[in-house]
Curated annotation (Swiss-Prot):
Pfam families for this protein: OMPdecase
Family under the similarity heading: Belongs to the OMP decarboxylase family. Type 1 subfamily.
PROSITE patterns: OMPDECASE
One Gene Ontology cellular component annotation held by this UniProt entry: cytosol
Keyword set includes Nucleotidyltransferase: no
Pathway field: Pyrimidine metabolism; UMP biosynthesis via de novo pathway; UMP from orotate: step 2/2
Stored SMART domains: OMPdecase
GO MF annotation terms: orotidine-5'-phosphate decarboxylase activity
Organism in which the protein naturally occurs: Syntrophotalea carbinolica (strain DSM 2380 / NBRC 103641 / GraBd1)
Enzyme Commission numbers on file: 4.1.1.23
Protein name, per record: Orotidine 5'-phosphate decarboxylase
Keywords per UniProt: Decarboxylase, Lyase, Pyrimidine biosynthesis
Binding site for substrate: 14, 36, 63-72, 127, 188, 197, 217-218
Assembly description: Homodimer.
Species classification: Bacteria, Pseudomonadati, Thermodesulfobacteriota, Desulfuromonadia, Desulfuromonadales
Length: 244
């Protein structure tokens, strides 16, 4: 189960330079399954950071949360495919047409080839968002209603899964079924601080709830022993998988 659990652990490369990113990739390759590249690192380094990770044999989650007019997002989706990422995401709040356009672009790009397409994920509600945050932007529905609603919208648009807090995993499973990937940030092992995440669980709890992939950054990066921290998280995930 350790190998399977390791494939499900995504390390967030929330760093300020390509050199720092490469240092982490060298340190953690083989210890985690996927490396997440977000807006800060991608804006600083561009596509080269994705190529660097792949050159080291790593998989990439391109976490840019595309949200624009459908044509623009569809073209961005094609560029993500060209980079060879393992998964990337769009904002579910962008609507059905935007998500469906991205899904169709991915299908068409891989239609004639033998390569495996990336997982296309919809971002539901950010784990840093509370109901007060939603009310500030005019959304009066509770988080536990909005998340499965957006997940169903994403599935109907042809996406492969969603990004959501582990607290809503059960709601998504009931609404969308088992054959729908759920990637969960907001995961904090017992030995780590919660930081700015609001709706969190431990790695074991998240896996037990039905998460397919866990995104972890600071609990590993801020540890005195990052490799050991990653291993402890993988072991907790593996134990939950065995119990499940």
């Amino acid at each position: 189960m350790l190998v399977e659990a390791r494939k499900k652990l995504i390390f967030a490369l929330d760093v300020e330079s390509g050199a720092s990113a490469e240092e982490w990739v060298r340190r953690l390759r083989g210890k985690v399954g996927v490396f997440k590249v977000g807006k800060q690192l991608f804006t600083r380094c561009g596509p080269d950071v994705v190529r660097m990770i792949r050159d080291h044999g790593g998989e990439v989650f391109l976490d840019l949360k595309f949200h624009d007019i459908p044509n623009t997002v569809a073209k961005a989706a094609i560029e993500a495919c060209r980079l060879g990422v393992r998964m990337f995401n769009v904002h579910a709040l962008g609507g059905r047409a935007m998500m469906a356009g991205a899904a169709e672009a991915v299908r068409e790009y891989f239609a004639a080839g033998e390569d495996v397409p990336p997982l296309l994920l919809g971002v539901t509600i950010l784990t840093s968002s509370s109901e007060e945050t939603l009310r500030e932007v005019g959304v009066d529905r509770p988080v536990e209603e909005m998340v499965p609603r957006l997940a169903c919208l994403a599935k109907g648009a042809g996406l492969d899964g969603v990004v959501a807090s582990p607290r809503e995993v059960g709601l998504i499973r009931r609404a969308c079924g088992r054959d729908f990937a759920i990637v969960t940030p907001g995961v904090r092992p017992s030995f780590a601080e919660t930081n700015d995440q609001q709706r969190i669980m431990t790695p074991g709890e998240a896996i037990a709830a039905g998460s397919d992939f866990l995104v972890v950054g600071r609990p590993i990066a801020a540890s005195e022993d990052p490799v050991g921290a990653a291993q402890r998280i993988v072991e907790e995930m593996a134990a939950a998988l065995e119990e499940g």
